[in-house]
Structures are given as structure tokens and as C-alpha cells.
Amino acid sequence: MKKIDFKVLLPNVITLSGLSFGLSSIRFALEQDFNLAILCILIAGLCDVLDGMLARHLNSESDLGAQLDSLSDFLSFGIAPGILVYMSIFNQESGIGTFACLVFIIFSCLRLALYNVRLELSKTSEEEPDNFFTGIPTPVGAILILLPLTHSFMGFDWAYENLNFVAAYIILI
């Protein structure tokens, strides 16, 4: 039986912790505890930073880790913020708000998949890799989609009064 090296395992444990916080964010959003839902997304972001730094520091980067990271990013910074914004701002509106949140989630998935494909192609290419990022990084997108919600927590209710504007803003992200 092959022995599992702790230094390879540790970054993946942190990634899976981030995934757990993303899942918890969805749970809290569905329970309408929006403050905790946002906090979970922020902690997932911290896990996302730490897992990569630790993997590079321990020289334990792996294909499994890269795939787990993308899946965790999609859930924590694509699905969770989309559901959170839908539940908090668009909960009573089914049309444009639903569409905007779906567009955000779908394009988060596409962006991460494109990144993974480019990363894989760069491994077989002899050329110097291009910048893999297309558009804004998914964690930044999560921060941007949450701005209208965080403004409402500070007493600025413009997001609830301008649903079409918020939907257009989300689609542009």
C-alpha cells in the first residue's frame, strides 16, 4: 500500500475546506442568513489563497489539486454568490434576476473550464505559456457580484429599488 505524503495532502484539505465554506454559504443563503453566507464566501477566498501558496511552498502541486481548486472555485465563487444574490435581492422577482444570476454562474464555469484547458495545453506546448486568464478571476467576480448586497447591509437600499440595473450590472461582470 502506497503511503500518503502529508505535504501533498495538506493543500487539498485546505481546498476542500474552502469547498465546505462555499457549500455552507449556499445553506445560509437558503436560510436567509445573508451575513453568514457572505462570511463563508470570504473564508472560502482565504482558503483559496492559502491552498495555492502552501502547495507551491511545499512543492506539492498536483493535477488532483488543480482540479479540486477549480471545482471549489466554481462552487464558492460562482454558484454560492449567484444563489446568495438571487435569494437576497431577486427572491421575489423571477425574470431578469434569475437570468442575471444564471449568466453569472454559467460564465464562471466557462471561465474556469477555459483556464483548465489552457493550463493543460501549456504542459504539452514548447512555447512560453500566454496569460491564462480570460476576463476577471472568479474570486474577483464573486466580490463584484456581492457589492450591491453589501451596500444594502450598510443602509443603501438602491439595489432593491433598481433590480433591472443590478441585473444588468451582474450580466456585465
Locate predicted features.
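C-terminal membrane-associated helical module and adjoining short loops/tails
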Residues: 2, 130-173
